[in-house]
Amino acid sequence: MKLVFASNNAHKLREVREILPSHIEVLSLQDIGFVGDIAETGATLEENSAIKARAVWQWMSLHSSPETATVNGVFADDTGLEIAALQGAPGVHTARWAGEPACDAANRQKALQALQGITLRDARFRTVVTLIMTGEMQQVEGFVNGKIALEESGKGGFGYDPIFIPEGYNQTFACLTEEQKNSISHRGRAMQALCRLLNDLKQ
């Protein structure tokens, strides 16, 4: 099976390829010749995930090529960090919370500064995945509960990984191995849900 992942984020692409089983070949936007960014204008993770998947699906319908001829579908994800003490922020604004252009380090510092002096540091990561096959759209999601650390630690991962401590652990995502993170992360769980959906669609 061939699926196009509707994202220009190289970190996400690598994680998705590591998580999904080997019988699912994940193509990048570069692989199919799609150039440019997709404006994420939705008010929710569900809307933004759908916007990205639809944009690439519609583009493929207008740009037939040997690369797209064998593609079975398109999927996209949108991920949000939801911090309880901040009423669910940054949420849909997670990637660009500190402003344009998107900067992981600046986003992390904004989170730490916003929680200075606050003991309630509960948070969760949520990923919504949109799948389009034969024109039909379906969505699944995955999430992981945790808390925001007092300071950055760890050198792995990306984004908010150095400040997010998943439930049941005393280290941030950035301190875990990729295998450990992928087995419990929001994106890992969303990809597991995607696999279950794909299996259901085959039956």
Predicted segment positions?
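Anionic-ligand binding patches
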Residues: 2-4, 10-203
